[in-house]
Design a protein with these regions (language model features):
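Conserved N-terminal Rossmann-fold NAD(P) cofactor-binding segment
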Residues: 29-81, 91-93, 97
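Amphipathic alpha-helical segments at domain termini/boundaries
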Residues: 25, 62-83, 164-173, 179-180
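NAD(P)+-binding Rossmann beta1-loop-alpha1 motif at the extreme N-terminus of oxidoreductases
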Residues: 1-53, 105
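Rossmann-like NAD(P)(H) cofactor-binding subdomain of soluble oxidoreductases
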Residues: 83, 88-148
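Internal alpha-helical scaffold of NAD(P)-dependent oxidoreductase catalytic cores
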Residues: 130-131, 148-181
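Structural signal for hydrophobic packing residues in well-ordered secondary-structure cores
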Residues: 47-55, 85, 106, 128, ...
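Acidic/polar active-site rim loop that often engages polyanionic ligands
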Residues: 26-28, 79, 142-152
Length: 181
């Protein structure tokens, strides 16, 4: 399996910030997307605020923000990303449009995972290019502290991509729970 080094996080609210913090704690290159540049400052503050807990949990000495970039362009965010964690609001219309865009700009072998807690993956990914690589990756909150993530495949999700997602989540100290669709 190709190692996943570059993670794109789409949406920088509570869940998105949690994924960003967890990935930074595991030395991943993280590209974050949100349409509002004003949110960058509050995100950086949240990363710094939570870092003492993360430092203890993962035995990290320092916070390296060199691995972190914030974009207001989804195309820039997705460039060369190996894993995409989408964290937008729970809304079918919004997520379906977003997944169509992500599918169009992500590299063909990039894993696409939605943090959705109650929407059906097949419906979310209805307009996504290469839906065999798409699934739900719903975390427990706060993501940077609680290590559980539910992985839910869509009808077109391949076992190969599910296994890659599982290994990635394990590489960032998550305990994947494989849910049948």
């Amino acid at each position: 399996m190709t190692k996943i080094n570059k993670v794109a996080v789409i949406g920088t609210g509570v869940i998105g910030a949690g994924w960003i913090i967890r990935c930074l704690a595991h030395n991943k290159i993280v590209h974050a997307y949100d349409k509002d540049i004003k949110l960058k400052k509050s995100l950086i503050n949240e990363i710094k605020r939570t870092w003492p807990s993360v430092k203890k949990l993962f035995n990290k000495k320092t916070l390296n923000l060199k691995n972190f970039k914030y974009f207001t362009s989804i195309q820039q965010t997705l460039k060369d990303a190996d894993f995409i964690q989408e964290c937008a609001s729970e809304n079918y219309s919004l997520k379906t449009k977003l997944m169509s865009t992500i599918g169009r700009y992500a590299k063909p072998n990039a894993i696409i995972s939605s943090s959705s807690s109650g929407l059906l993956p097949t419906k979310i990914y209805a307009k996504c290019k290469n839906p065999e690589r798409a699934m739900i990756g719903h975390p427990f909150n706060p993501v940077y502290l609680l290590p559980a993530v539910e992985i839910v495949p869509g009808k077109k999700t391949s076992k190969k991509f599910l296994e890659k997602a599982k290994k990635f989540y394990e590489s960032i100290s998550m305990n994947p729970i494989m849910v049948k669709h």
